[in-house]
């Protein structure tokens, strides 16, 4: 494996969307520090990592109330003390609830407000910079959910509104109620189905694009070896792409990316991340990590330059036909953007 491109480049700033929010061109996804990717990591180490990121210029911090649940927001609350809050753009999310041991998606006004109050309390802040609906509630017209978020903006509790895993039509309906600043979606070398409809819709409406899992949930850092190292508590063990019947074919994609990275003098993860950065000045990837060394490597991806020919070559390695398996287990796939249409506003009876 090639040496990493150094993290010498300053992390540039970018406008996210067209409503006035400015962020670092690369953010930090904080989920894996507390949840889903194995046991929670030691809190002092994670606070140090967040502080290192902010000092390096990675100031968009991304969390959600479902990470833990709640523990990731509490971690960020500790990391933001001592003047750090003023140096960051803080993004969190609502909408996935665990009730009676079952996962539910909620976007009704009372829930939206209660969730926001809970996040403000855990984060120890009086305002959230970017507040996303994490998953779309298919029982509630999107106009109703956004209407409550609009009130929270007017009250100063949140500054900007975002959506995650929303279809193009849902984005349009939401944006008509209150301008949407950002849409968060999975976008990487091997997750490109958003390019057909959602990305053009965001660009037409002046909505910023936040790419989560830009490294394929770590796959583009280590390939098949990543899967061997996962603990039993790691939800990636259940992702179809990481199952044995799909892994052999998917590993070939990684090996091709790895070989190209060696030629470019960077790591495969830097190459995969650079590909996302090259999608446009309106795109902000938010790779997650729990190690300072990997964070520095991710920042180094900002200095990896790709020609149009190299972009096309990379894309040829991971065409839709080459990628085996879905990006989510079946139980979670029913809340992705492909399943995010909501009832018409005319059907809503206020509770």
From Swiss-Prot:
It is an enzyme of class 1 (oxidoreductase). Gene3D superfamilies: NADP-dependent oxidoreductase domain (3.20.20.100). CDD domains: AKR_AKR13D1 (cd19145). NADP(+) binds at residues 213-223. One of its GO terms (molecular function) is aldo-keto reductase (NADPH) activity. Substrate binds at residue 134. Signal peptide: none annotated. GO terms for cellular component: cytoplasm. InterPro entries: Aldo-Keto_reductase, NADP_OxRdtase_dom, NADP_OxRdtase_dom_sf. Its EC number is 1.1.1.-. Residues 332-351 have a biased composition (Polar residues). Residues 317-351 are annotated as: Disordered. The active site is at 67 (proton donor). The keyword NADP applies. Keywords: NADP, Oxidoreductase. It holds the Pfam family Aldo_ket_red. Belongs to the aldo/keto reductase family. This is Probable aldo-keto reductase 2. It comes from Oryza sativa subsp. japonica.
């Amino acid at each position: 494996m090639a040496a990493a491109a150094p993290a010498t480049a300053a992390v540039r700033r970018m406008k996210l969307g067209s409503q006035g929010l400015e962020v670092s061109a690369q953010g930090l996804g904080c989920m894996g520090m507390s949840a889903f990717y194995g046991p929670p990591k030691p809190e002092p180490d994670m606070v140090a990592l967040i502080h290192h990121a902010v000092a390096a210029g990675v100031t968009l911090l991304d969390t959600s109330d479902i990470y833990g649940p709640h523990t990731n927001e509490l971690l960020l609350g500790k990391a933001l003390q001592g003047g750090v809050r003023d140096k960051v753009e803080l993004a969190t999310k609502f909408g996935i609830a665990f009730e009676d041991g079952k996962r539910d998606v909620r976007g009704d006004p009372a829930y939206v407000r209660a969730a926001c109050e809970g996040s403000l309390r855990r984060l120890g802040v009086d305002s959230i910079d970017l507040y996303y609906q994490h998953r779309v509630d298919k029982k509630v017209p999107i106009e109703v959910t956004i209407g409550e978020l609009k009130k929270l903006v007017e009250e100063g509790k949140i500054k900007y509104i975002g959506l995650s895993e929303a279809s193009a039509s849902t984005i349009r309906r939401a944006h008509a109620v209150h301008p949407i600043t950002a849409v968060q979606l999975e976008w990487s070398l091997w997750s490109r189905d958003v390019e057909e409809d959602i990305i053009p819709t965001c660009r037409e409406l002046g909505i910023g694009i936040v790419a989560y899992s830009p490294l394929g949930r770590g796959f583009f850092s280590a390939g098949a070896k990543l899967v061997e190292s996962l603990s039993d508590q790691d939800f990636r063990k259940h992702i179809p792409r990481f199952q044995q019947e799909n892994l052999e074919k998917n590993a070939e994609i990684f090996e091709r990316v790895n070989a190209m990275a060696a030629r470019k003098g960077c790591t495969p993860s830097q190459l995969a991340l650079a590909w996302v950065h090259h999608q446009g000045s309106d795109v902000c990837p938010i790779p997650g990590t729990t190690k300072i060394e990997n964070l520095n490597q991710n920042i180094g991806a900002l200095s990896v330059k790709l020609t149009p020919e190299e972009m096309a070559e990379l894309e040829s390695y991971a065409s839709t036909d080459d990628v085996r398996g879905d990006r989510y287990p079946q139980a979670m796939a029913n809340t992705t953007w492909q399943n995010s249409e909501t009832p018409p506003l005319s059907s809503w009876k206020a509770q």
